[in-house]
């Protein structure tokens, strides 16, 4: 199924784009090459290819969720220019 110049012009009108004749030709050629490539992909025999969710096999991408020691809250807050109610206090940047 080839993309025609009329289809390019119709889509351009719907998108409110003004295309030159040269751009229409270029887009038609590019879209037709893309569609040819998709057609070649569709013809591939993938009957023996198992379905996958990811292109690369991932082996245990997540570590075990176990608690680890963290920084002391008071020591971290001592580094803050300002702190209030156990939290960093930052300048207001929005109005309202």
Swiss-Prot record:
Q: What is this protein called?
A: Aspartyl/glutamyl-tRNA(Asn/Gln) amidotransferase subunit C
Question: Which InterPro entries does this UniProt record tie to the protein?
Answer: Asp/Glu-ADT_sf_sub_c (IPR036113), GatC (IPR003837)
Which Pfam families does the record match to this protein?
GatC
**Quaternary organization:** Heterotrimer of A, B and C subunits.
What EC number(s) does the entry state?
A: 6.3.5.-
Q: Which UniProt keywords apply?
A: ATP-binding, Ligase, Nucleotide-binding, Protein biosynthesis
What organism is listed for this UniProt entry?
Symbiobacterium thermophilum (strain DSM 24528 / JCM 14929 / IAM 14863 / T)
Return the SUPFAM superfamilies for the record. Answer: Glu-tRNAGln amidotransferase C subunit
What is this enzyme's class at the first EC digit?
ligase
GO MF entry, a single one:
asparaginyl-tRNA synthase (glutamine-hydrolyzing) activity
Question: Per the UniProt entry, what are the Gene Ontology biological process annotations, in alphabetical order?
Answer: glutaminyl-tRNAGln biosynthesis via transamidation; regulation of translational fidelity; translation
- Catalytic activity entry: L-glutamyl-tRNA(Gln) + L-glutamine + ATP + H2O = L-glutaminyl-tRNA(Gln) + L-glutamate + ADP + phosphate + H(+); L-aspartyl-tRNA(Asn) + L-glutamine + ATP + H2O = L-asparaginyl-tRNA(Asn) + L-glutamate + ADP + phosphate + 2 H(+)
Query: Which Gene3D superfamilies does this one have?
Result: Glu-tRNAGln amidotransferase C subunit, N-terminal domain
Per the entry, what this protein does is: Allows the formation of correctly charged Asn-tRNA(Asn) or Gln-tRNA(Gln) through the transamidation of misacylated Asp-tRNA(Asn) or Glu-tRNA(Gln) in organisms which lack either or both of asparaginyl-tRNA or glutaminyl-tRNA synthetases. The reaction takes place in the presence of glutamine and ATP through an activated phospho-Asp-tRNA(Asn) or phospho-Glu-tRNA(Gln).
Q: Where does the source fall among the domains of life? A: Bacteria
Q: Which family, according to UniProt?
A: Belongs to the GatC family.
């Amino acid at each position: 199924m080839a993309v025609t110049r009329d289809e390019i012009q119709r889509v351009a009108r719907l998108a409110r784009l003004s295309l030159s004749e040269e751009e229409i030709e270029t887009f038609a050629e590019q879209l037709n090459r893309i569609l040819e490539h998709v057609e070649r992909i569709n013809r591939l025999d993938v009957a023996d290819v198992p379905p996958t969710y990811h292109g690369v096999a991932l082996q245990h991408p997540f570590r075990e969720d176990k608690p680890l020691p963290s920084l002391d809250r008071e020591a971290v807050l001592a580094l803050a220019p300002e702190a209030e109610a156990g939290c960093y206090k930052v300048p207001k940047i929005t109005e309202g």
